[in-house]
Amino acid sequence: YFCPGDNGLPVFQRQNAVIGLLVCYDWFFAEVWKILALKGADIICHPSNLILPGLAQQGIPFHAVTNRVFIVTANRIGTEGSLTFTGNSLIVDARGEVLSHAPAAKAHVDVVSIDLERARDKAVTFRNHLFEDRRPQDYEELLSMP
């Protein structure tokens, strides 16, 4: 059912948007969201086979806010073997507002309008900026830890 991928953290241009891609369990790791945001992603697409009820759906808005990106989490529904997938797909804006929340066990399609400038504006306040205020030297230790 599940195995790690080897495609890295891709971003690609589609019309005037930069789209990043995370898959399933990737959502759990804050670093990958930040990398995609730093690569210029306006929207992060997150296809998933989530099986822990509500956990990702609670965390996804946090990742949207802390990276100022739109997130589209498309989660599977139904059961296969012993696994039941939790549905509840989400579209979240760059300020963490849930724009669409699908049901847990029913196929759902939604269309929302987004303003890409909301993702491109990384100012938190007139004094605070998500990228300019980063201190990468403080996280160097993280890279050397097992």
What would you call each of these model-derived segments?
Residues 1-39, 47-48, 52-62, 124-128:
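Active-site catalytic loop in hydrolytic enzyme cores
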Residues 11, 76-146:
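C-terminal beta-strand edge segments of enzyme domains
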Residues 42:
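Conserved acidic residues
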Residues 48-49, 74-76:
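Short secondary-structure boundary segments
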